[in-house]
Curated annotation (Swiss-Prot):
The modification Phosphoserine is found at residues 23, 59, 97, 175. Residues 61-83 have a biased composition (Basic and acidic residues). It holds the Pfam family WKF. It comes from the Eukaryota. This is Protein cholesin. It comes from Homo sapiens (Human).
Amino acid sequence: MAKQKRKVPEVTEKKNKKLKKASAEGPLLGPEAAPSGEGAGSKGEAVLRPGLDAEPELSPEEQRVLERKLKKERKKEERQRLREAGLVAQHPPARRSGAELALDYLCRWAQKHKNWRFQKTRQTWLLLHMYDSDKVPDEHFSTLLAYLEGLQGRARELTVQKAEALMRELDEEGSDPPLPGRAQRIRQVLQLLS
């Protein structure tokens, strides 16, 4: 059987018109829910103005959409006021790259810091990039080899399998490997883990 297309009832068009009308008339949120947050309920709940009730025709989803739009408008107005006052919004500090975080993780492991703890994402990054001398410099590679000695389980098995596959690939290329440093790193990892 062929599926029949569902006709959009006129009721939704009426709801959309009412939603536009409600947003044009003004916010449903009273001055109690101003950005200062003095009169707002706990956890930022919206407080309706006493004179205006939400229209019963608006579904909960439509109300959420309307509230999101109003919140966005309030934030925009707040930024505009700050800009006019000459204050610049503070930008969050730049996030550190994955390389920096992973190498910092490795250094903390080597120094046996109390705040060091296993982090799978950092270990995964190190295992993926350990053959690249640009991403894991030579001064950190010896530390990485010491870290790999303690590698356990599936991570150890996969690292050995990948190293063997890379070695086979280098052997097939011939006697002149394009990256001798990479080949040396692969050999060191294989000798350590095999």
